[in-house]
């Protein structure tokens, strides 16, 4: 099926237009808009960030989380245990935990493959974007940020809470 250029443009413009009380933003990598959207979403957090991550390696994203923690935002993360045993991940985990971020490791599944943040109980960031340098600069990835959809955010919060409760505290 061939998509007409005008239909594509209309779809892209519609994706960032607020709908009633809801708004949706999208970003892609390696073009840079995915990374920028993730960082911007973290930057605007006021109270809480609950993150689920397969890869926890990206220095700029970890720094943004630490900066949020220093602003008084409570940051919690559930990350895949097996994926994050290498030096880069261990350095990121050590830096994050030394700066107040509460990290739990999940090894209950073949992969803890979620890539999601719930921010302030009203914003959801999700997509294929791993929190790793390869997602920023090498892979074809996507990010979706939804605001003003409390039912959707509540479902993701329940999913996060279930993973948080079964994951192990990082030593």
Regions found by a protein language model. Name each.
Residues 9-16:
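Bacterial N-terminal signal peptides
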Residues 55-59, 81-85, 109-111, 123-124, ...:
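Solvent-exposed loop/turn segments at secondary-structure junctions
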Residues 20-24:
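Boundary at the C-terminal end of the N-terminal hydrophobic targeting segment
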Residues 29-34:
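A general structural motif
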Residues 36, 119, 124-171:
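Signature of lipid phosphatidyltransferase scaffolds
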Residues 40-101:
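Primarily the HKD phosphodiesterase
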Residues 1-8:
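Bacterial N-terminal signal peptides that target proteins for export
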Residues 25-27, 50-52, 76-79, 104-105, ...:
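Structural recognition of the beta-strand scaffold that forms the well-ordered cores
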């Amino acid at each position: 099926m061939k998509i007409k250029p005008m239909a594509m443009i209309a779809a892209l413009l519609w994706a960032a237009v607020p709908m009633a009380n809801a708004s949706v933003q999208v970003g892609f990598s390696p073009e840079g808009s995915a990374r920028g959207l993730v960082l911007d979403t973290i930057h605007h957090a006021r109270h809480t960030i609950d993150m689920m991550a397969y890869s926890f390696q990206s220095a700029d994203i970890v720094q943004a989380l630490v900066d949020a923690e220093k602003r008084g935002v409570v940051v919690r993360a559930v990350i895949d245990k097996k994926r994050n045993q290498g030096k880069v991940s261990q350095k990121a985990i050590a830096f994050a935990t030394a700066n107040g971020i509460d990290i739990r490791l999940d090894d209950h599944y073949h992969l803890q493959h979620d890539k999601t943040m719930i921010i302030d109980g009203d914003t959801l960031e999700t997509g294929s974007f791993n929190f790793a340098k390869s997602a920023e600069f090498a892979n074809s990835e996507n990010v979706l940020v939804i605001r003003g959809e409390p039912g959707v955010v509540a479902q993701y919060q329940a999913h996060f809470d279930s993973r948080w409760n079964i994951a192990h505290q990082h030593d």
